[in-house]
Every structure is written in C-alpha cells, then in structure tokens.
C-alpha cells in the first residue's frame, strides 16, 4: 500500500489489548486531503469503529485519549457527511486473520493548520461504529463503538523515514 506523495507526513504506531498492533501513515496531499494507509493486526474479525481522538495522551492506555476530535462541536456521524466530528472515520474491517488494511482519504483530518490532528491519537474500537444512526444513547456521541482496543499518537514524520 503506497501512500500518495505529499508535503506533510505523520505516523502512528498502534498498540493495545490482546496483541493489537499496527503502523499507520498519514500523508496530506497538495489539495489538503489526508490519506491514511497501513495495517492493524490482532483484532477480532469484523468491523471496528475507527476515530481520531482529541488527545495524544496514552498515560492511562487508550482511555486517556479523550473524546473524538470535534473542533466544530458537531454530532457524531458517518465520514461521508458534513455533520460529523472531524475525527469520525467510520469503520475498518478486520478479516478472519484479525488484520485490517487501512486505506482512507479524508479532508477533515489535516496535518497542518488550526484543526491539525498532529499530536492527537487514532483509536480502534472493539465494536462497529453505528455512524450516529443506531438509536442508542451513545450513537450521537461515540457511534456506540464500544471499548478502545488499540491506539497510537499521531506524530510528524521526517520525509527520510517515510518508507515504513
């Protein structure tokens, strides 16, 4: 999986419960869209909520990453709609081998500017994200995606280190 060429690059090393591990690369292209690529292993097969959370703090595991990144104070929603948290990236799918291959393009998670995601955390949840449409009391805030099974801090990457 080759990420597009761009000026800004970031990386997140994912760690968590039950040997959940991964490496994600973030590349902001010249149009401002951020491309997220990589793999996460150790997941249960099926869909898992996938979000950018507000804080790059893992001192208390993934719980200390705070809520979804939401600088515009919107309700939770699917990644293809404007009414959503900036950090709402929907779901990733882990195959029967427990590996999810990530290939996401999103204009709401820039690596620069006022709403940059640098220094924040990416989080994988135990359950599917209902995209704000599940009718559960947590649907409009978390997508009712369950516990946090893995996370990593999004850090600026040197262009010399871009080949992971």
Curated annotation (Swiss-Prot):
EC number: 1.15.1.1
GO BP: any one term: cellular response to high light intensity
Cofactor(s), names only, from the UniProt record: Cu cation; Zn(2+)
Entry keyword Cytoplasm: no
GO CC, alphabetical: peroxisome; plant-type vacuole
Stated induction or repression of this protein's expression: Upon photosynthetically active radiation (PAR) (e.g. light fluence) increase or after high-light pulse, and UV-B treatment. Accumulates in response to ozone fumigation, during recovery. Repressed by salt stress.
Record's catalysed reaction(s): 2 superoxide + 2 H(+) = H2O2 + O2
Annotated cofactor note: Binds 1 copper ion per subunit. Binds 1 zinc ion per subunit.
Motif (Peroxisome localization signal): 162-164
Coiled-coil annotated spans: none
Highest taxon of source: Eukaryota
Any one Gene Ontology molecular-function term assigned to this protein's record: copper ion binding
Matching PANTHER family: SUPEROXIDE DISMUTASE CU-ZN -RELATED (PTHR10003)
Family according to the record: Belongs to the Cu-Zn superoxide dismutase family.
The protein's name in its UniProt record: Superoxide dismutase [Cu-Zn] 3
Protein species of origin: Arabidopsis thaliana (Mouse-ear cress)
Organism taxonomic ancestry: Eukaryota, Viridiplantae, Streptophyta, Embryophyta, Tracheophyta
């Amino acid at each position: 999986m080759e990420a597009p060429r761009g000026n800004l690059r970031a990386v997140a090393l994912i760690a968590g419960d039950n040997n959940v591990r991964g490496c994600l690369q973030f590349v902001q292209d010249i149009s401002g869209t951020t491309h997220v690529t990589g793999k996460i292993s150790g997941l249960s097969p099926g869909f898992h909520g996938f979000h950018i959370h507000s804080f790059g703090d893992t001192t208390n595991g993934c719980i200390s990453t705070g809520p979804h990144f939401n600088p515009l104070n919107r309700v939770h929603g699917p990644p293809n709609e404007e009414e959503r948290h900036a950090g709402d990236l929907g779901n990733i799918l882990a195959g029967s081998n427990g590996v999810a291959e990530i290939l996401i393009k999103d204009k709401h998670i820039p690596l620069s500017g006022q709403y940059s995601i640098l220094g924040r955390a990416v989080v994988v949840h135990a359950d599917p994200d209902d995209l704000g449409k599940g009718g559960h009391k947590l649907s409009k805030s978390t997508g009712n995606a369950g516990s946090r099974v893995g996370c990593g801090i999004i850090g600026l990457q040197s262009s010399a280190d871009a080949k992971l």
